[in-house]
């Protein structure tokens, strides 16, 4: 645990983990064993994380993520990053133009530096977000998101009359 780091109020750290300087880890969050947390990170209320964060990563409010998170990344409330596939397979990745199937951590999430997620964003197993990218609120990301790209949901809604007569009490 680094200098000036606060670990408080029900934080759970499983097994061995490295936590950098000037971090705040509190309010019933959970850090998986073997994780490495950079400097000046905030891991807060009920956030669950396992993997590696670079410096100045903010993980808040009921989110779950396993993987590698780049510098100055902000993960929105209730963001979920899946780590298992229904077919129990491993995700194929494109690395420098080549297709690869890593033996380890293929289904982890990889979020680039200065990226963000909105409330209730879902990132499917093995998806990567580029540098300066945004996964907007309510988006289900099922493919890699390039650098300098924002993806948002375009929602259609329906309004109807509603009142106490509908309840039948």
Regions found by a protein language model. Name each.
Residues 1-54, 60:
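Acidic, glycine-rich loop-and-beta core segments that form the ion-binding/anion-interacting portion
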Residues 28, 43-169:
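Glycine-rich hexapeptide-repeat left-handed beta-helix
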């Amino acid at each position: 645990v680094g200098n000036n780091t606060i670990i408080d109020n029900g934080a759970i750290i499983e097994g061995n983990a490295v936590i950098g300087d000037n971090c705040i880890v509190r309010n019933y969050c959970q850090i998986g064993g073997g994780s490495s947390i950079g400097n000046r990170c905030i891991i807060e209320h009920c956030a669950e994380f396992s993997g590696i964060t670079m410096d100045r990563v903010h993980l808040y409010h009921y989110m779950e993520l396993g993987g590698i998170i780049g510098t100055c990344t902000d993960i929105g409330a209730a963001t979920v990053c899946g780590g298992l596939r229904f077919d129990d397979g491993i995700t194929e990745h494109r690395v420098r133009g080549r297709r690869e199937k890593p033996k380890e951590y293929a289904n982890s999430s990889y979020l680039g530096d200065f990226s963000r997620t909105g409330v209730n964003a879902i990132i499917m197993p093995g998806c990567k977000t580029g540098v300066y990218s945004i996964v907007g609120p309510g988006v289900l990301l099922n493919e890699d998101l390039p650098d300098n790209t924002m993806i948002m949901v375009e929602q259609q809604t329906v309004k109807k009359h509603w009142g106490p007569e509908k309840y039948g009490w």
